[in-house]
From Swiss-Prot:
Cofactor: how bound: Binds 1 Mg(2+) ion per subunit.
Similarity remark: Belongs to the succinate/malate CoA ligase beta subunit family.
Record-level GO cellular component terms: cytosol; succinate-CoA ligase complex
Binding site for Mg(2+): 208, 222
GO MF annotations, alphabetized: ATP binding; magnesium ion binding; succinate-CoA ligase (ADP-forming) activity; succinate-CoA ligase (GDP-forming) activity
Function: Succinyl-CoA synthetase functions in the citric acid cycle (TCA), coupling the hydrolysis of succinyl-CoA to the synthesis of either ATP or GTP and thus represents the only step of substrate-level phosphorylation in the TCA. The beta subunit provides nucleotide specificity of the enzyme and binds the substrate succinate, while the binding sites for coenzyme A and phosphate are found in the alpha subunit.
Keyword tags: ATP-binding, Ligase, Magnesium, Metal-binding, Nucleotide-binding, Tricarboxylic acid cycle
Reaction(s) the record says it catalyses: succinate + ATP + CoA = succinyl-CoA + ADP + phosphate; GTP + succinate + CoA = succinyl-CoA + GDP + phosphate
Protein name: Succinate--CoA ligase [ADP-forming] subunit beta
């Protein structure tokens, strides 16, 4: 689960990390009020979308007016810029060419920057450890730095048996090139970030840029946080952040139903159990010349209610021209799942082509139930067969 920058900054502040003062605004009046609450101009207006590259982005409706992050000199300019940003679609290197609508802004104080750094924490799958990634060269061009100057990227893994220790903080300070009092601030900041990361079950905590101000303070100016969806049950307050800030109502509905759903740009809706199987299904759809419309994992113990919810979510996307169900019945019985598919197909009156591939526990009974249902459900013997059939079906109906 991802959250917006304004939520990330507030969460870090609650966990003892000093951040640049700022307030969220959902309309022009709130933007003006937010600026009035800050100490003094200049101000920074930051578009709140769940994508990076905002500073170098542009608004689809007004590509020459400026990017998604703007520096303004007074409150009158806050009002003018908020009017030109809210409700428009911000296009960045991480969005499609349609962009993402900006529904919220973060108004912050501007800081005088002496140096910019990059600092993040993530779960390193190769080492199985929480790892700091640090670079003395932060800011909007960090991707270029990583590509052209990999020696400027430093990784510090934390042994879970010992946790964060003072020497880790010193290693991070040296990696960033800090000195003097700012070095001490860096050690304290790293310890606070590690504690926030581990106690909140984060999967990514990225500070870019982390800045040293002209008056010698070390402050996060921007923060990106992702959480482990499987641990959200331990953090209802954090789960509420995702529900309040969800940019896609279908993703919010899926989360509430216990489903993992991500909307994509294709035309074939996918319903699969297991993330690995889901990715394999999406790959083979592309291999046969079409694109998946979504990633949807119903999990290992999908009930009839979950299956029905999954179909509702998939069919709510008008770009879906056909549906491929690919289920391996291990814990889940294929005959029970088939009953759920049949019930959902009847309840929702599915009119797009539906191909179902079942394998595993009680697979023969499941296939028999689908065939005898009287519904236009196309069964498949394996994943390749399923992909061929759904691609052929949507092209035939096009």
């Amino acid at each position: 689960m991802n959250i917006y920058e304004y939520q990330a900054m507030a969460l870090l502040n609650e966990r003892g990390v000093s951040v640049v003062p700022g307030y969220m605004a959902a309309n022009v009046e709130e933007a003006v009020k937010a600026a009035e609450q800050l100490s003094s101009p200049p101000y920074v207006i930051k578009s709140q979308i769940l994508a990076g590259g905002r500073g170098k982005g542009y608004f689809r409706e007004s590509p020459k007016e400026g990017g998604g992050v703007r520096l303004v000199s007074d409150i009158a300019a806050v009002k003018k810029q908020a009017e030109s940003m809210l409700g428009r679609h911000l296009v960045t290197a991480q969005t499609d060419d349609q962009g993402i609508p900006v529904e919220k802004l973060l108004i912050t104080e501007a800081v005088s920057i002496a140096r910019e750094f990059y600092l993040s924490l993530l779960v390193d799958r190769q080492t199985g450890r929480v790892t700091f990634v640090a670079s003395p060269e932060g800011g909007m061009d960090i991707e270029t730095v990583a590509k052209e100057k990999p020696e400027a990227i430093h990784r510090i893994a934390i042994d879970p048996a010992t946790g964060f220790q003072p020497h880790h903080g010193r290693m991070i300070g040296f990696a960033l090139g800090l000195s003097g009092d700012v070095f001490k601030q860096g050690i304290k900041l790293a310890a606070s970030l590690y504690k926030a990361f581990t106690t909140s079950d984060m999967s990514l905590l990225e500070i870019n840029p982390l800045v040293e101000t002209n008056d010698g303070k070390l402050l996060p100016v921007d923060a990106k946080i992702s959480f482990d969806d499987n641990a959200l049950f331990r953090h209802p307050d954090i789960a509420a952040l995702g529900e309040a800030g969800a940019s896609d109502p279908l993703e919010q509905e899926a989360r509430q139903a216990g489903l993992s759903y991500i909307k994509l740009d294709g035309s074939i809706g996918c319903m699969v159990n297991g993330a690995g199987l889901a990715m394999g299904t999406m790959d083979i759809i592309q291999l046969h010349g079409e694109m998946p419309a979504n990633f949807l994992d119903v999990g290992g113990g999908a009930s009839k209610e979950k299956v029905a919810a999954a179909f509702r979510i998939i069919l709510s996307d008008p770009s879906v021209k056909g549906i491929l169900v690919n289920i391996f019945g291990g814990i889940m019985r294929c005959d029970i799942l088939a009953e759920g598919i049949i019930a959902a197909a009847r309840e929702l009156d599915i009119t797009v082509p539906l191909v179902v591939r079942l394998e595993g526990n009680n697979v023969n009974e499941g296939k028999a139930a689908l065939v005898s249902s009287g519904l236009p459900i196309i069964t498949a013997s394996d994943l390749g067969d399923a992909a061929q059939k759904i691609v052929a079906a949507i092209r035939q109906t096009a």
